[in-house]
Amino acid sequence: MKAAVVGMLNNVGSSTSHHGGGYYHVMMNILKAEHPGELFFNPDPSTWNEYERLYILEGVNYQENVFNFIGGPQPEHRAKLEAMAKYTGLAIAVNVPIDLNVFNKRFGIDHQFTSINCIDFAKLYGDTTRKLVRGDSHSLSVWKPGYGLDRTDGKTLFGFLKDADTLIDKWNEKYDEVILYFGNIDLRFHLMRQENPQQATGELFRRYVQFAKKLNNATLVNLLPVEHESRKLPGTGLYLKQPYFGTRQQRMELRDTANRIMNNSGLNTLQWPDEWIDEDGMKMFEYMEPKQSVHLKPRYYMFSDQFIK
């Protein structure tokens, strides 16, 4: 079956320097594994009817039917929409629903678009392989081929553990292996605001370990080294209008506590290179994406050599 992967807002990217590119690399790998044939990426909209199936893959920050046209709607957006109006094959939204009638409000094309089926391939793939990566936005950086992905941006470890025990039986039926990656958000924004940060960190990560030990085969990921305090974050990345709470040194000490608990638990753990750590955290800027962000460049993902060419 001849199929293509396209984006309505932006073309499917392949950057190895930006978080968004990491998402595309992960999803391209999953789609290639799930699709029974060759996939083509970003063909010209005038050729879309040559493909029996179109996978519509929007970017990492896309939310259902929220269309942010950077610089305003462009001719290429209209060309894609007009191509979809003429498309006679099967269109599938990847992971997040898309309503082209909402998209069309900015263009006014005389066409009523039919509903597009949405399939969460990221999670579905894990159902097939019985392997899952579960975490916050950082979970992209520890995804590896053969694993599904269940990503909740902004999810804290504290929040995840609130109802985590309800997942145990379900996960043990569905998955033989699970990689868990939470905690960086707690370290940045929450732990240093507790009455006794060291105690709070210890209690939180011991609960994490206890949960993970109830799963068939869980792997925990160590927290990232803390970058220099001069790192700028976008407004959407702030909490209570602050980029972090606690000094870098204080947070590095809590990181050491958290990682020690995980590494001494008897569970499998994934650890970031010690070479990333220097005296003041400036070296981390080499490994983080160049824009204002807390994320790694995809080329430094834990298993990048297995799926990013």
Label every model-predicted segment.
Residues K2-P36, A79-A85, I92-L161, T166-K174:
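Serine-esterase "nucleophile elbow" of acetyl-processing enzymes
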